[in-house]
Each structure stands twice: as structure tokens, then as C-alpha cells.
């Protein structure tokens, strides 16, 4: 339940259109107006995934800090890691405004931003100036007008390999025409071959091998999931992120806003994304890391992602409704859930409801 102060702050922020409010929140983090979260590190929440050690399993998903303006400020809110981007080689404006819509009754957001960002060079300059403390991933994408989208992903690997703690290849945004076609098996094989070859080449030269994750859509057929799992394993991908936004509008209360085109995120995405997560875990086996995203709004929903097969979880849209105190609340809540479950480590609980979620309707 949102407290009265948060309710008042949200009401004030919601007087502005969503994109203006987003810019205001970035400015507040930059200026230090948002207080840091005081969390006592809990070793039970610590996870080593893809060779990286995460103080806790909660991350900020890509899409909020597109241009790497506030990664350190986000980490101070209690996140165990954060992900900047999606960044493309060249700056691009994205789709025309309005392009973000709040569905307040549903605690959801629809966006059709279209990879608006300042490009590789701007983000690289900011990341290079960071202290180096904390895990900051880089989510890479392709320009809308690119003649060779795979080359754009390779360019991202080459540009950011010295500053990224991990990469995410985002091929699942519904807002760049044709981008999701890269999830088709033949295209995906070509993408992974090129991206991982570039990563290995720069690793050989630098001595620094950066893990690569693939972010996939929730709107996949069973055959599509089979294909992605097979290619991920065949190419020794470092991990998956499940999932991006959905095109589905099932069960929404706000039918007026539901008519807007774009990807839906927030609370209504939880069931679908968690079911796809479990299905992918079944397909890839126990060893491949998976980050679960979609509808995480509490410690309970974060833990449920882990029970469904995730090693780590991310959120974004639910913070729009709950405010910057949400990550701290979730991390503290996870510690309490560890007490309740009498678990020595959160990894013990992974897959404990895998069968349940894998059987759920997608």
C-alpha cells in the first residue's frame, strides 16, 4: 500500500505528462534531491551470476536511464545493479509525442518511444567518468534507419566493452519496426554469432570478457521459445532477460488508454512474463542465467520471479506508481522473506515454483 507522502508526491508528478515527469525524476536524481536508501547488506541476498557478484538480486531495468545520466544515483536507491539504454550507434529522436501513457487503474504503462537516445558517444562519455563501483549493464540496440542492424549491435559491443559490466542485446522492443524479426531462428543465429564473436575479439585484446544477455519478448509462440533456447545454448550465450513489454491488452481496466499502440509494462505484465520465464527455464536448463522482468512491484513478486526460474530480477514501471523508495522496500522485504523461508541464500528458492509457472497460460 502506498503511504500518504508517496501518494501526495505521485499526485503532484502525475499532473505532468509522463515524459515530462520522467525528465523531472532524472533531474531530481542528478541533483541529489532523492535521498539514498539505507540498507544493511544481507549476505543471503548476494548472488554470483555470469561471473558477476550482485549484492542483491534487484536491478533497474533498461528504459529509465537511457543515456547513462544517473546510474550511480539509482544504485544508491537500493538496487543491486542497473542497466542503461537502450543505446543506438547514432542519436535518434524516437517516435512522435505523445508516446508514453499511464494506465493508473492498472498500474501499467504503454510506451512507443522507439529507442529515443543520444547515441553511443554521449552514453560512453558518461560511463567512462563513473567511479567504477557497482554493476552497470549496457543495453544495446539498432537505429531505426540502419541498413545493417546486426552491425549496430556489434558496434555497441566494441564501443562499450571497456565500461560495461554486462551487455544486453535488445531485440524485443515492439516500437522499432521489424526489430522483433531478429528473434526468428536464422536471424537470431546470425546476430548471436556476430555479437559474441565481437565480444570474444575485444576480450582477447583487452583481457576483459563481458557477459552478453539477450532480452526477449513475452509474445512468443512455443516454437519461438524453442528456437531462442536452442540458439542461446548453441552459441553459449551468457544469459537471457525475460521479458520486454507486451502487445497484449488482456484484462485491462483502462480500455481508453489500452487502445494506444506500443508495449505494455507494469503490474498486468507479471503473469505473462513470469510464465514465459518459467517456460524458458525449462528449455535452457538450470545453468543458464536468467533475469526476470515484468510487473515486479513488491518483495513477494520479486521472489516469485526467482521461484519461477530467475536468478535476478529487474523493475521499472512499478516505480512510476510506488516511487523511489520501492527498491529499498523490496530489498528489505526480501530479507524478511529469507527469515520466513529459513533460507541460507536466495538462490535456494530458485525454481521452487517452476512447474506451477511453466504450466500457466501465456
Swiss-Prot record:
Enzyme class: oxidoreductase
Compartments reported by the entry: Cell membrane
Active site: 173 (nucleophile)
Cysteines joined through disulfide linkages: none
BP GO terms, sorted: 'de novo' pyrimidine nucleobase biosynthetic process; 'de novo' UMP biosynthetic process
Signal peptide interval: none
Cofactor(s) required, per the database record: FMN
Membrane topology annotation: Peripheral membrane protein
GO MF entry, a single one: dihydroorotate dehydrogenase (quinone) activity
UniProt EC number: 1.3.5.2
Cofactor binding note of this UniProt entry: Binds 1 FMN per subunit.
Keyword Glycoprotein: no
Residues binding substrate, per UniProt: 66, 111-115, 170, 175, 244-245
GO CC term, one of those recorded: plasma membrane
Main location: membrane
Entry keyword set: Cell membrane, Flavoprotein, FMN, Membrane, Oxidoreductase, Pyrimidine biosynthesis
Keyword Signal appears in the UniProt entry: no
Oligomeric and partner information: Monomer.
Primary role: Catalyzes the conversion of dihydroorotate to orotate with quinone as electron acceptor.
Stored PANTHER family: DIHYDROOROTATE DEHYDROGENASE (QUINONE), MITOCHONDRIAL (PTHR48109:SF4), DIHYDROOROTATE DEHYDROGENASE (QUINONE), MITOCHONDRIAL-RELATED (PTHR48109)
Protein name: Dihydroorotate dehydrogenase (quinone)
Name of the encoding gene: pyrD
Amino acid at each position: 500500500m502506498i503511504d500518504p507522502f508517496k501518494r501526495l508526491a505521485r499526485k503532484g508528478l502525475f499532473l505532468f505528462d509522463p515524459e515530462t515527469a520522467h525528465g523531472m525524476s532524472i533531474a531530481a536524481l542528478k541533483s541529489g534531491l532523492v535521498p539514498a536508501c539505507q540498507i544493511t547488506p544481507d549476505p543471503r541476498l548476494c548472488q554470483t551470476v555470469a561471473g558477476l557478484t550482485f549484492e542483491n538480486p534487484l536491478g533497474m531495468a533498461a528504459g529509465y536511464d537511457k543515456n547513462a545520466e544517473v546510474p550511480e544515483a539509482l544504485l544508491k536507491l537500493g538496487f543491486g545493479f542497473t542497466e542503461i539504454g537502450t543505446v543506438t550507434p547514432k542519436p535518434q529522436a524516437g517516435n512522435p509525442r505523445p508516446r508514453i501513457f499511464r494506465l493508473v487503474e492498472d498500474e501499467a504503462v504503454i510506451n512507443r518511444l522507439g529507442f529515443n537516445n543520444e547515441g553511443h558517444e554521449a552514453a560512453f562519455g558518461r560511463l567512462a567518468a563513473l567511479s567504477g563501483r557497482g554493476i552497470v549493464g549496457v543495453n544495446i540496440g539498432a537505429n531505426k534507419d540502419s541498413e545493417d542492424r546486426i552491425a549496430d549491435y556489434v558496434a555497441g559491443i566494441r564501443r562499450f566493452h571497456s565500461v560495461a559490466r554486462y551487455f544486453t542485446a535488445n531485440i524485443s522492443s515492439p516500437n522499432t519496426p521489424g526489430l522483433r524479426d531478429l528473434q526468428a531462428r536464422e536471424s537470431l543465429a546470425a546476430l548471436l554469432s556476430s555479437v559474441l564473436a565481437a565480444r570474444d575479439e575485444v576480450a582477447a585484446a583487452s583481457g576483459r570478457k563481458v557477459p552478453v544477455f539477450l532480452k526477449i519478448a513475452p509474445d512468443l509462440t512455443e516454437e519461438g521459445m524453442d528456437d531462442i533456447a536452442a540458439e542461446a545454448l548453441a552459441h553459449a550465450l551468457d544469459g537471457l532477460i525475460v521479458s520486454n513489454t507486451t502487445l497484449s491488452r488482456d484484462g485491462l481496466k483502462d480500455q481508453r488508454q489500452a487502445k494506444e499502440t506500443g508495449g505494455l509494462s507494469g503490474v498486468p505484465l507479471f503473469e505473462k512474463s513470469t510464465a514465459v520465464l518459467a517456460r524458458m527455464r525449462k528449455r535452457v536448463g538450470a545453468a543458464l542465467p536468467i533475469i526476470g522482468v515484468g510487473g515486479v512491484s513488491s518483495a513477494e513478486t520479486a521472489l516469485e520471479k526467482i521461484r519461477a526460474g530467475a536468478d535476478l530480477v529487474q523493475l521499472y514501471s512499478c516505480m512510476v506508481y510506488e516511487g523511489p523508495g520501492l527498491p529499498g522496500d523490496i530489498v528489505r522485504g526480501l530479507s524478511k522473506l529469507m527469515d520466513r523461508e529459513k533460507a541460507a541464500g536466495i538462490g535456494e528458492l530458485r525454481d521452487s515454483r517452476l512447474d506451477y509457472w511453466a504450466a500457466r497460460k501465456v
